[in-house]
């Protein structure tokens, strides 16, 4: 009988990527097939996030539901991974003794051995260590699911912003070697992937080893990825202003595969609050980056993260944030009310902004961003946008749907053979959450740039011969 695996994922795109790798790994080693129904599963995995408020209680609430399933099926294996597991592993074991496996973001590759151990002697396993980049060496080959894919290029963060748990839960920055990244992307391209989103907690801090032992920059990596035939669109997230160097901006000037959209978190427009946050940059330095970017790529649109109600934030500080939002003209944002994360320096600060004031500031900020986003959408009316067709529209099975470079969903009439390809669409209608258009050009008429085939990249970067024997590539 087929063994089944259920994974519940909370949090960032890195967690989504990790969960997909867990599924691929346990399919390869144990034959587990994914199911959306927890009651059907032989193994339940919870991939957690500790960024938001009450993250721990959310975990225990979910585990309480799964405990009932285990009471009915004692052979059921329950595992908790992700950032809450990394931060609170022993506490989870003490409070939820029925949990069999606790693993961190850097030890998910050891899940097969952990499951075997639990199956063997029923002893619980806790492994929340930080074995650097080892996990990527033990994951199965990537499997494409549609024309877009996420690829993790680094882990961790060295910035230690005062509100953030990432350095404590995912460790400090560790970069994957460039050949490993290119090999994975080339494999995805060979399976029909057209757009890759490079992931990292501080993605533009990537400094990976090249085949000759030298260290490559993030700008170098972007150009190498863009050279792979079939990869015609590149995104990356999440970046940090302090690492946004001029060589990255030059890639925007000369590499059309890099989209005209950037998510660059700023958090606040007040230098005083930025200093309390440990951000190590000013609002003016942030605006200077945007100015250079728009000189290199005039049509680029910017999104950001904001925290409102940080300890000590005054009305004047908030007004400076609103001024920054207007000056940059952000297209969208992920914005949240400050909530202290245990173990961070900000948790020891006096949270002196009233809750109602925080909510009011968040409402004002989000309303302004929404207005700016709609204005950006209206400017697209009558323009021709290049769309990567992802599949049928959720609005109508008779229509197709895809995304623009600036991440707008566009619905339009088309044929099934367009799925997985690019089309140029004239925007005819603008709605709050989507656009509508009509196809004016198909991919065959575009003459997309070709540089190096995926097969060539695979042959150049693979670490073993046809017999599976590893070899040294000078």
Swiss-Prot record:
Where are the disulfide bridges?
none
| Subcellular location field | Cytoplasm
Q: Which GO terms describe its cellular component?
A: cytosol
Query: From the UniProt record, which GO molecular function terms apply?
Result: 4 iron, 4 sulfur cluster binding; metal ion binding; N6-isopentenyladenosine methylthiotransferase activity
- Residue stretches making up the MTTase N-terminal domain: 3-120
Q: What is its EC number?
A: 2.8.4.3
Name the PROSITE patterns on file.
MTTASE_N, MTTASE_RADICAL, RADICAL_SAM, TRAM
Main location group: cytoplasm
Q: Tell me what reaction this enzyme catalyses.
A: N(6)-dimethylallyladenosine(37) in tRNA + (sulfur carrier)-SH + AH2 + 2 S-adenosyl-L-methionine = 2-methylsulfanyl-N(6)-dimethylallyladenosine(37) in tRNA + (sulfur carrier)-H + 5'-deoxyadenosine + L-methionine + A + S-adenosyl-L-homocysteine + 2 H(+)
Cofactor(s) for this protein? [4Fe-4S] cluster
Subunit architecture = Monomer.
- Return the similarity comment: Belongs to the methylthiotransferase family. MiaB subfamily.
What is the protein's given name? tRNA-2-methylthio-N(6)-dimethylallyladenosine synthase
Q: What is the lineage of its organism?
A: Bacteria, Pseudomonadati, Pseudomonadota, Gammaproteobacteria, Enterobacterales
């Amino acid at each position: 009988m087929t063994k089944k695996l259920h994974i519940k994922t909370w949090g960032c795109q890195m967690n989504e990527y990790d969960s997909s790798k867990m599924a691929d790994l346990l399919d390869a080693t144990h034959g587990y097939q994914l199911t959306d129904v927890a009651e059907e599963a032989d193994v339940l995995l919870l991939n957690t996030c500790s960024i938001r408020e009450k993250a721990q209680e959310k975990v225990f609430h979910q585990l309480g539901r799964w405990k009932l399933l285990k009471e009915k099926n004692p052979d059921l294996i329950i595992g908790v991974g992700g950032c809450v597991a990394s931060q609170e592993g022993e506490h989870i074991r003490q409070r939820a003794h029925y949990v069999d496996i606790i693993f961190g973001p850097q030890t998910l590759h050891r899940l097969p051995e952990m499951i075997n151990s639990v199956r063997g002697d029923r002893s619980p396993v806790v492994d929340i260590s930080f074995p650097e980049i080892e996990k990527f060496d033990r994951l199965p080959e990537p499997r494409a699911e549609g024309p877009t894919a996420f690829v993790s290029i680094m882990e961790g963060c060295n910035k230690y912003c005062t509100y953030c748990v990432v350095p404590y839960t995912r460790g400090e920055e560790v970069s994957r070697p460039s050949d490993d990244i290119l090999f994975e992307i080339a494999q995805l391209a060979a399976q029909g992937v057209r757009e890759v989103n490079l992931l990292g907690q501080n993605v533009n801090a990537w400094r990976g080893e090249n085949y000759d032992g030298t260290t490559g920059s993030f700008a170098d990596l972007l150009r190498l990825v863009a050279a792979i035939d079939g990869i015609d669109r590149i995104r990356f997230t999440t970046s940090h202003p302090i690492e946004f160097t001029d060589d990255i901006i030059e890639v925007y000037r000369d590499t059309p595969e890099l989209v005209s959209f950037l998510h660059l978190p700023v958090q606040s427009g007040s230098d005083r609050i930025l200093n309390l946050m440990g951000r190590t940059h000013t609002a003016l330095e942030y605006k200077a980056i945007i100015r250079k970017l728009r000189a290199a790529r005039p049509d680029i649109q910017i999104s950001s993260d904001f925290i409102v109600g940080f300890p000590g934030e005054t009305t004047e500080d908030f007004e400076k944030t609103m001024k920054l939002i207007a000056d940059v003209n952000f297209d969208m944002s992920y914005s949240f009310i400050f909530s202290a994360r245990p173990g961070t320096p900000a948790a020891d600060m006096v949270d002196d902004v009233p809750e109602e004031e925080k909510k009011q500031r968040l409402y004002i900020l989000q309303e302004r961003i929404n207005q700016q986003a709609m204005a950006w959408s209206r400017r697209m009316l009558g323009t021709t946008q290049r769309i990567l067709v992802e599949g049928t529209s959720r609005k109508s099975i008779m229509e197709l749907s895809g995304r623009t470079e600036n991440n707008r969903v566009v619905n339009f009439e088309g044929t099934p053979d367009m799925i997985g390809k690019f089309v140029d669409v004239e925007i005819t209608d603008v709605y709050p959450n989507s656009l509508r258009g009509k196809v004016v050009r198909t991919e065959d008429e575009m003459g997309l740039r070709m540089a190096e085939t995926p097969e060539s990249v695979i042959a150049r970067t693979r670490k073993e011969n046809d017999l599976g024997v590893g070899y040294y590539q000078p």
